[in-house]
Amino acid sequence: MAKAKYERTKPHLNIGTIGHIDHGKTTLTAAITKTLSQVGGAKATSYEEIDKAPEERERGITINTSHVEYQTETRHYAHVDCPGHADYIKNMITGAAQMDGSILVVSAADGPMPQTREHILLSRQVGVPYIVVFMNKTDMVDDPELLELVEMEVRELLSFYEFPGDDIPVLMGSALKALECGCGTRECEWCKHIWELMDAVDSYIPLPQRAVDKPFLMPIEDVFTITGRGTVTTGRVERGQVKVGDEVEIVGMREATRKTVCTGVEMFRKLLDYAEAGDNIGTLLRGVDRKEVERGMVLAKPGSIKPLTAFNAEVYVLTKEEGGRHTPFFGGYRPQFYFRTTDVTGIIQLPEGVEMVMPGDNVQMAIELITPIAIEEGLRFAIREGGRTVGAGVVTSLNE
């Protein structure tokens, strides 16, 4: 078969392997690259290379993550795999590796285990929208009824956490056997299962909406006045696009929002007709006084986001070694919450039955800010104390 050349025209998705330790996530990642390398869709990456994941820093937190890339006939994928359980938690909460979908690896010999459950819950909490299941190590199970039983258990667990357990594709195979064989053909007893998995990922996980197609939002980083022209706010467009003449809403830091019109957009001192996600811009706002706008607010498409003070979140608390707290904290703890461009004080309420939170824990909590911020589900934040990061979190639901 002719080598597939990397076409930038293929749509791009971010995915990753999740699941319990030793169920075969890293072996599967290696097997996917090995199988696809046979048709020129990847560079074969060994288990050892993936396992020695380099350290990365995201929001002041060190995370070990391995990235591989590969492509099928229709898509290009960036795939993340983490060596340790704590790395997964940190990765998912900080959004260091935003996943459009994930491959849940479950050992057919063991069935779902505690981290299987925890990774499914985290996926639900942080908004990983789609899961495909790979039941691994089927070569170690002789009894087909046992396989059916494990599949049923996995589907029930997914349904429990509000994923469509009955509809999710569940594929079976042995990542190790496919990796050892390495022929990569669809006819092969072991390699064919890797192809079946990739076909399922291709067809079941839809393409994500591009940032540019979402409603406009720009966190305000700075504000200044141009004499005779008016007030300019600067920042990087997070999503969507803004055109000269568009109505925009200023949201956050106050109870009320304020609508205005964007009368000018410039980037690198050049005037533009419009700007889109990723651009660093200055926007001229009609009739807005310098005192009415400050860092920490956002410019957004009117009605697309509200200023709120109360929300629920999933939080990872840094360990002492990571530069976090040395001692636990309790309900009523009042740190700073850093959203986008600014710190706001908030009060933490712990769930019933949770007395205290230790460094290294991940926990669900309710938070009440003293100042309203433009908040939505999936928004990431850091928890800071005296200028240093002590935790990272993601908004899971809003309390209006």
Curated annotation (Swiss-Prot):
A Pfam family per the record: GTP_EFTU_D2
Top EC class for this record: hydrolase
Keywords for the protein's UniProt record, in alphabetical order: Cytoplasm, Elongation factor, GTP-binding, Hydrolase, Magnesium, Metal-binding, Nucleotide-binding, Protein biosynthesis
Domain of life where this protein originates: Bacteria
Localization, UniProt: Cytoplasm
Binding site for Mg(2+): T26
Region of interest called G2, as start-end residue ranges on this chain: 60-64
Domain tr-type G positions: 10-209
Region G3: start-end pairs: 81-84
Catalytic activity reported: GTP + H2O = GDP + phosphate + H(+)
GO molecular function: GTP binding; GTPase activity; translation elongation factor activity
InterPro entries found in the cross-reference section: EF-Tu_GTP-bd (IPR041709), EF-Tu_GTPase (IPR050055), EFTu-like_2 (IPR004161), EFTU_2 (IPR033720), G_TR_CS (IPR031157), P-loop_NTPase (IPR027417), Small_GTP-bd (IPR005225), T_Tr_GTP-bd_dom (IPR000795)
One Gene Ontology cellular component: cytosol
Binding site for GTP: 19-26, 81-85, 136-139
Coiled-coil segments on the chain, per record: none
Region (G1): 19-26
SUPFAM superfamilies: EF-Tu/eEF-1alpha/eIF2-gamma C-terminal domain (SSF50465), P-loop containing nucleoside triphosphate hydrolases (SSF52540), Translation proteins (SSF50447)
Protein task: GTP hydrolase that promotes the GTP-dependent binding of aminoacyl-tRNA to the A-site of ribosomes during protein biosynthesis.
NCBIfam families in UniProt: EF-Tu, PRK00049.1, PRK12735.1, PRK12736.1, small_GTP
Subunit field text: Monomer.
Family under the similarity heading: Belongs to the TRAFAC class translation factor GTPase superfamily. Classic translation factor GTPase family. EF-Tu/EF-1A subfamily.
Protein name: Elongation factor Tu 1
Species name: Syntrophomonas wolfei subsp. wolfei (strain DSM 2245B / Goettingen)
Gene name tied to this protein: tuf1
